[in-house]
């Protein structure tokens, strides 16, 4: 047991969230991911999936809000970089070009 759910139960909820995302039932994916985050607030996979869902809905302010603390992704450099890129895209969509340049510089893509 890893917490509130057994490990296989948590994996099942993650598979369900990803399935909903893949079939474009984004709101259902968000509900599943938020349930995971309610039980496991530091779950990097769930936080990243939430960002992807908001990006798919073109809810760029929510992408920015969820990625405000990029240190939450420090334990997984690949996820952190993809979240930084989605954050930069959201900033660009909202016309915050200086913030985009800063993010790209921080991840070595200037």
Feature roles, as predicted:
Residues 11, 45, 79-82:
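Start-of-helix register in tetratricopeptide repeats
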Residues 41, 75-78:
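Short coil turns that delineate tetratricopeptide repeat
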